[in-house]
Amino acid sequence: MAIRQLSETLINQIAAGEVIERPASAAKELIENALDAGATRIEIATAGGGKALLRVSDNGSGMDAADLELAVRRHCTSKLSETLEDIRTLGFRGEALPSIGSVARLSIASRRRDSAGGHEIAVNAGKVAHLRPAAANPGTIVEVRDLFFATPARLKFLKTEKAEAGAITEIVKRMAIAFPAVRFVLSGSDRTTLEFPATGDDHLARMAQVLGKDFRDNAIALDAVREEISLTGFAGVPTFNRGNSAHQYAFVNGRPVQDKLILSAIRGAYAETIPSGRHPVAVLSITLDPALVDVNVHPAKSDVRFRDPGLVRGLIVGAIREALARDGSRAATTGASDMLRSFRPGFQPQAQRPQTAWSAETSPFRPYQPTTGFSERPQASFDGLSMPTARAEPPFSPQPAAADTTARYPLGAARAQIHANYIVAQTEDGLVIVDQHAAHERLVFEAMRKALHSKRLASQVLLIPEIVDIPEEDCDRLMQHAAELAELGLAIERFGPGAIAVRETPAMLGEVDAHGLIRQLADEIAEWDTASGLSAKLEYVAATMACHGSVRSGRRLRPEEMNALLREMEVTPGSGQCNHGRPTYIELKLSDIERLFGRS
C-alpha cells in the first residue's frame, strides 16, 4: 500500500484523540486559554454533561480578526516562540481549538478591548467557515456543540452525563484554587452549580470556597524552600482526612497537575498519622525555574517530570512533617461538628408532653448530690506519665479558685473523668473531651521514638520472666529479629518449643501486657514479611508497644494525673491523633454548647 499524506481534517482528529479525551478535557483547554488571556471572570455553561454544549466565556484580552483566523489552524499560538524549555503559560500546544473543531461544531466570538466591534468564526467537523463581524463584549466566547459527532466511535467511551459533568466540575475546582483572583461560575442546563467569587490574594479564602470552611479551620500553612524550589500551600491536620484522595490538589508553577510523585510524597508525609484507607487533604503549590520541569510529557499536561524528583519529594515530605510537628497537638474541628449534629433535643414541648402523675419513685431523676466528678478512693500512681515535661497541678477542688490559671492552657483544666475513659477539661472558651487511652498511647509512642533515635531507650528487667506460648513459626520470626527488638527495650529468648520468654520490657511502658504484645508483634512481623530486618519498621513496632503500655480504658485517674496528661499533650507533636490516626480529643466551644440549648 502506497504512503500518502493525511488530510488536514484527519490529522486534527488524530490530535483530538490525544488532547481531547472527554468534555472535561475540552473545558480544561478553553479555561486555560481564558486565563492566559488575562481574564478575571470566567463563566462555563454545559448541557448533556458537556457533550451537547460546552460554552466558556471570559473578559480577557480578546482576539482581532487576524488572530481568530489563525486560532483555528494547527500549530498556531501566541504562547510559544522557539523553545520548550521556558514555558510560562498554561496552554501552548496550538492544537486545542483546531482539534476540538475537527470533532465538534465550534464557534468563537471575540473582541479586543480597544476595538469597536468583534468577529466570529465557526468550524464544523474540521471545515472552517468564513470570518464575519459580530456583536460581542470585550473578551471571548467559545462554544462547542455536539462533541465527537464527527467521530461517533469516541462517544462509546464516554461515561454518563452525570459523570462527565462531575469531571468538568473537578476541572473548574482545580482552576479556581490555582487562580483565586478570578471569578468562576459553572452552570448546567437549568441552574448554577458552582460560583466562586474572586478572593484576590487570599488563597485560603478560595480554598474554603472550594473545599469548605472546615478545611480553613483545620489547615496548617506550608512555606518551605530548598535549592531554589519553593513550596507553599496548606495541609490538613491528620484527623481531618477523607475516604479518597480527591481532595489533594497540586500545582506546579500555577499549573494544576495530578503527578504521581507529588501524591506519593503527600502519602509519605502522613504515613504514620492517618488510618489505613484514609487520605489527607492538602493543597500544594510548587514554584521553580521552568527549565527544571518538563510539563510537556503528557498531551493533557496533567503529569510533569522534574529534573530532580528526589529533591522535590524531600521538600514536600519535610515541609508537611515539620508543619504537623509544629502544630501537632491540634485535632480536627469536624469531630465537634459531627457530635453537634448527633445531638437531638431531649425534651418535648409542654403541649405535646403526656400528662402523667409524678412521683419520686417513678421519676428518672434523682435528688441532687454534690460530687467532685472523681472517685474518692485512693488512686494508683500514674506511672505512664513520668516524663520530665509533665507538670502536676494542685489538688482538684469542686469550687473553682479565683486564680485558676489552668483553664488558660490550650487544653484547659481537668474537671471530671467520665466512664473511667474520658477526661472532661474546661478551657477559657469551652470544653475539651479527651480519650485518655488514645492520648497517652500517642505520648508514649513519641517518647519511644525520640529515645529510639537517640539510642537511649531504657529497659526494665522483669523479676519473673513472662512465658508466652505461640506457634513455632512465630517463635522463629520473633527470634530472627530479637536484636532489633532489644533496641526497643524488649528482650526475648527461646523457652522451649512454641514458647518465648520475655525478660525485659521498655521502662517507659511501666506494666505491660507481655502476652498480648508478643502475639501482636508476631502477627505484624508475619504480615510485613521483613526477612531483611525490622530497621524500616521499628517505629511501627514502637507504636504497637505504646498501645500495650499506655493508660487503659477503665482506669480512674486523679486530678493531677489528668492535668499532667493535658500538659504533656500540649507540648508533644502529633498528640492530636493516636497512633492509628483517630482523634485524641474533641473541643466544644461555648458558642456550640449555647447553640445546643437554643441560646445563640
Curated annotation (Swiss-Prot):
Q: Which GO terms describe its molecular function?
A: ATP binding; ATP hydrolysis activity; ATP-dependent DNA damage sensor activity; mismatched DNA binding
Q: Which GO terms describe its biological process?
A: mismatch repair
Q: Identify one Pfam family in the record.
A: HATPase_c_3
Q: List the disulfide bonds.
A: none
Q: What does this protein do?
A: This protein is involved in the repair of mismatches in DNA. It is required for dam-dependent methyl-directed DNA mismatch repair. May act as a 'molecular matchmaker', a protein that promotes the formation of a stable complex between two or more DNA-binding proteins in an ATP-dependent manner without itself being part of a final effector complex.
Protein known as: DNA mismatch repair protein MutL
Keywords assigned: DNA damage, DNA repair
Looking up PROSITE patterns in the UniProt record yields: DNA_MISMATCH_REPAIR_1
Q: Where is the signal peptide?
A: none
Give the span(s) annotated as Disordered.
348-375
Comp. bias (Polar residues): 349-362
| Annotated CDD domains | HATPase_MutL-MLH-PMS-like (cd16926), MutL_Trans (cd00782)
What NCBIfam families has UniProt attached to this entry?
mutl, PRK00095.2-4
Q: Upper lineage ranks?
A: Bacteria, Pseudomonadati, Pseudomonadota, Alphaproteobacteria, Hyphomicrobiales
Naming one, the record's GO cellular component terms include: mismatch repair complex
Instruction: Name the HAMAP family on file.
Output: DNA_mis_repair
Q: Which gene encodes it?
A: mutL
Instruction: Name the PANTHER family on file.
Output: DNA MISMATCH REPAIR PROTEIN MLH, PMS, MUTL (PTHR10073), DNA MISMATCH REPAIR PROTEIN MLH1 (PTHR10073:SF12)
